């Protein structure tokens, strides 16, 4: 079976989307993977070797020589890296400050279709995909590449909707959002099988897109539950800092610092690849209490989470951010469940992931930031609660989200399409 993965970001285990792909597909024997993506950043995984990168930089750089657009390569961890990846990182940081303008430029780059050159067509032909797996996202390359494959091959299309990106009430003047809505709907319409990350999303998207959706979220390679508690107590968050999650972690760091009261009774370690400004850096780095670390390989993150006492999932209470993530089921929840540590979720229960966390035995859910100090103090005063809760969550994970069960189910459903 040949599977072509089409995605926006590089297949990198250190970021959420890449980690999800590896969680699904690692250990699939007799399957050939290839990946098409719209960034210059290098991949980082043990599954896929063959790649084709079509970044906006490449399109504009070779605007008058379209035959040079795109980069096909075999991934080699020790090999040379793209000279444009550093430029791209700087461009993305600039784009965040001028989002509207850069979104227009980004969409126009792929609208030219100059990237559909002979190199691209040969890559698709050589991949000879039986199945295309893509995220249900508003990325223009994803939509246009899926459409090309649908029209020019016999491959079955499988889409996976993770983030709630559709905006039903977009203004008639908001052309950018209207276009995103169109891409999202068209990807679903072109799909032979659609997945969504939470049941609430499955139900709503069935009505929205007129297609049935199946529930799918990451599986757990489950560790044994904790038997001892560290001193100081270790809180760990590993994930992106988008959607004001940085603000929630800042509030948590402040609460831990208040409970510590000059002694190091607990500490918070944050691991993220998200770029932050000096204000956020200062908020998340409190001497003796909290530290923001750079992203680490997922295998290292798993070990860090296993060695922690309390693993975290957080969402913002800001109304605009709640709208953005209301149907999202964070991949961090399964990462937390597999760690063997106690799980804590902070956020409003109107968000699907927090609502789900409330149903996990042993998971402490904080729905009001004013309760943080008392919650932390209670855990410090009774360490056995951490052990007891870790055991409860571990039992639930083994019964409901075991990794091999998930992979076997996925492989079976993929084969059933052929």
PLM features per residue range, with description:
Residues 272, 278-307:
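Nucleotide-activated donor-binding/catalytic signature segment of Leloir-type glycosyltransferases, i.e.
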Residues 122, 144, 148, 152, ...:
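Membrane-proximal helix-turn-helix segments that form the acceptor-binding/catalytic region
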Residues 197-200, 218-219:
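Carbohydrate-associated surface elements
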Residues 228-249, 253:
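Conserved donor-binding/catalytic core segment of Leloir-type glycosyltransferases
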